[in-house]
Amino acid sequence: MIDDRKLQILRAIIQDYISTGEPVGSRTIAKKYNLGVSSATIRNEMADLEDMGFLEQPHTSAGRIPSSRGYRLYVDRMIEFERLSSEEEGLIRSSIIDGTLYEVDKIIKQTSALLSELTKMTCIVKAPSVHKSFVKSIQLLKVDDVSILCVLVTDNGVIRNTVIKVKSVPISEELIKISKIITERLKNLTIEQINLEVISNLNRALSGYEDIVNAVLPALYESLKGDETSEVFLEGTINIFNYPEYNNIHKAKEILELLHDKKSISELISDSDDMTVKIGDEIFVPEAKECSIISAGYHVGDRSLGTIALIGPRRINYSKVLSIMTEVMKELNETLKNK
């Protein structure tokens, strides 16, 4: 059991280390923080905190730094969210574009760029493969006498446009009718569910327009095919170099290789809808043992769709980063609510 004085000292050490990046000694805490105890008492408490696993001593320093366990206690029991400035709040509101006017993937990419800019961390987006998306609607529009623009909209808001060639393009009224029938027959199906029976039924429903059906379906397949695993993309990879923890060329190379390994990155990120913070030893990928990862889910309508995460060293300003992440995800999910 950790008492209140130890908690106060641990909080002071973590806040000082986050601010300076330098190991913290008892004299520093005694001078900078009004804790009402002597340097000797603080030194003894720090020794106890180290024995309890909340502090570590770097080999080359007499000072102490927080361990993963220390950061975890700080995040769980001591953190106070930093109030965002009016400029930051305004930037968040203005940067997440109107969800009724743009594709979901564009909104997510813009949001990841915003998070990377505000936190100075690397942002990771884990989204389900388009391969797993459901058809929401298909609209056919005349381009010329032998060309039709096929506009596919999926349930997660992704829009794909493909031009198909046919013998002769029907009049607009017929195209509207064909679009409606195709949408009715394919709605809420994934590419894997569009089997021979579905195709046969569609051809019967659109007798006389088989050439259009036979052109639309391959176009649909091309739009939705792809890797069956989650899609992962990064924003702000260069932000890693903002931290002295990665001044060491070996560590920098290791983290960059990790960031470009999509399978490993996908395993790093929690699929929980809730805000999740993983620190150091809680991360089961060896190359990320000295990192922190903050992640949260995003939704389209009522459907949980993907995860946005921030990755950096253990020494980050949790108060500020969690405030930014909370506000951005709130704004994002509100924007996507009616998609």
Curated annotation (Swiss-Prot):
Transmembrane segments: none annotated. Belongs to the HrcA family. Signal peptide: none annotated. This is Heat-inducible transcription repressor HrcA. Pfam families: HrcA (PF01628). Negative regulator of class I heat shock genes (grpE-dnaK-dnaJ and groELS operons). Prevents heat-shock induction of these operons. NCBIfam families: hrcA. The keyword Transcription applies. It comes from the Bacteria. GO terms for biological process: negative regulation of DNA-templated transcription. Keywords: Repressor, Stress response, Transcription, Transcription regulation. GO terms for molecular function: DNA binding. InterPro entries: GAF-like_dom_sf (IPR029016), HrcA (IPR002571), HrcA_C (IPR021153), WH-like_DNA-bd_sf (IPR036388), WH_DNA-bd_sf (IPR036390), WHTH_transcript_rep_HrcA_IDD (IPR023120). It comes from Clostridium perfringens (strain ATCC 13124 / DSM 756 / JCM 1290 / NCIMB 6125 / NCTC 8237 / Type A).
